[in-house]
Design a protein with these regions (language model features):
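Membrane-interface interhelical connector segments
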Residues: 226-242
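Structural signature of multi-pass alpha-helical membrane transport proteins
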Residues: 5-26, 41-56, 84-85, 157, ...
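Central hydrophobic cores of alpha-helical transmembrane segments in multi-pass inner-membrane proteins
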Residues: 29-46, 108-115
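Generic alpha-helical transmembrane segments
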Residues: 33-37, 174-179, 249-251
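Hydrophobic alpha-helical hairpins/lids featuring a short glycine-rich hinge
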Residues: 36, 76, 84-105, 109
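Juxtamembrane helix-loop boundaries in multi-pass membrane proteins
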Residues: 1-12, 24, 28, 51-78, ...
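C-terminal ends of transmembrane alpha-helices
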Residues: 10, 14, 47, 75-85, ...
C-alpha cells in the first residue's frame, strides 16, 4: 500500500521532470507485481491448507486485515489515474468511473458485514484492553472511496462529477465518523491499560490515516467541482465558496 502511495506522490510533485515521472511509473509497476505476488501467496495458503480461509475470516483479529486487500486495490486505481489516463484515450476514464461505483458498492457491503460479524460473533470477542487502531480497518476502504473520487473526478465529464463528489464526500464522512468514534475507545484503552506491547506500537500509526485522507479527499474533490454545470452555473460563486470551505474543514 505504501508503495502505491509513493508512486502517486512522485506523480503529484509540482516541480517534476520526465525522469521523475518514469521513476513513478516504475514504482507503480513494482506495486502491481507485489500485489500479484502477495495475492498468489495468500491464495496458495488457502488452497494448500483447507480450512485456513474460514478460520482467517472468522478470527476476530486476523479478519481485521481483510480490508487491506481493497486498500491495495484503490492504490492501483489511483496509479492508473495518475499514469494511465494521461497516456490513453477516453475509454480509461469511463473504466475508472465504472470501477469507482463497483468499488464503492463492494467496500460498503464489506464494512457493514464485517462490523456486524464482529458485533455478533460468539464466542471470540475483541476486548477494550486489546484495542488497537486496527479496529478502524473495516471502514478504511469505504473512507478511501473519497480519496478515490478526488483522484478521478477531475478527468470525468461534468455530468458525472457532481454524483461522484457527493458519493465521495458521503463515504469519506462515514469513514471519518466511525474512525472518530474508535479514537475515543482507543484513548480509553490507553488511559486504563497504558501503551500496547512494543511489537504492537507501530500499529498506532494507523490512527493517523483517517484525518489525513479526509483532508486530502475534501480538498481534491472541491478543486474539481463543475463550476459551469448545473446549480454551480446558476450560482457562479458557489464552487469557489465550497472549495474554501473544504480547505477550512481540512485544517
Amino acid at each position: 500500500m505504501a508503495t502505491g502511495g509513493i508512486a502517486t506522490l512522485l506523480n503529484a510533485q509540482p516541480n517534476t521532470f520526465t525522469g521523475l515521472t518514469t521513476i513513478g511509473k516504475v514504482v507503480f509497476i513494482y506495486e502491481i507485481v507485489l500485489f500479484l505476488c502477495f495475492t498468489a501467496f495468500i491464495s496458495a495458503r488457502f488452497i494448500m491448507f483447507p480450512g485456513t480461509f474460514t478460520s482467517a475470516i472468522s478470527h476476530p483479529t486476523e479478519s481485521l486485515f481483510i480490508p487491506t486487500f481493497f486498500l491495495s486495490i484503490v492504490d492501483i486505481f489511483n496509479g492508473i489515474q495518475a499514469f494511465g489516463v494521461p497516456s490513453t484515450g477516453v475509454w480509461l476514464v469511463v473504466v475508472q468511473r465504472v470501477c469507482f461505483w463497483i468499488y464503492l458498492a463492494c467496500v460498503l457491503m464489506l464494512s457493514i458485514g464485517q462490523y456486524t460479524y464482529l458485533f455478533t460473533a460468539p464466542p471470540k470477542r475483541l476486548t477494550v484492553q486489546a484495542m488497537t487502531p486496527a479496529w478502524i480497518l473495516p471502514i478504511f476502504p469505504t473512507m478511501l472511496t473519497g480519496t478515490f473520487a478526488s483522484q478521478i473526478v477531475s478527468t470525468q465529464p461534468a455530468v458525472h462529477r457532481a454524483t461522484i463528489i457527493v458519493a465521495g464526500v458521503s463515504m469519506q464522512g462515514l469513514g471519518w465518523m466511525v474512525s472518530f468514534m474508535m479514537y475515543s475507545v482507543f484513548i480509553t484503552r490507553l488511559m486504563q491499560h497504558g501503551l500496547p506491547e512494543p511489537n504492537m506500537r507501530p500499529g498506532m500509526f494507523i490512527a493517523v490515516g483517517p484525518p489525513s485522507f479526509t483532508s486530502l479527499a475534501l480538498i481534491g474533490m472541491s478543486q474539481s467541482i463543475p463550476a459551469s454545470y448545473g446549480v454551480f452555473a446558476v450560482n457562479p460563486g458557489m464552487a469557489e465558496m465550497l472549495e474554501q470551505l473544504a480547505i477550512i474543514v481540512a485544517m
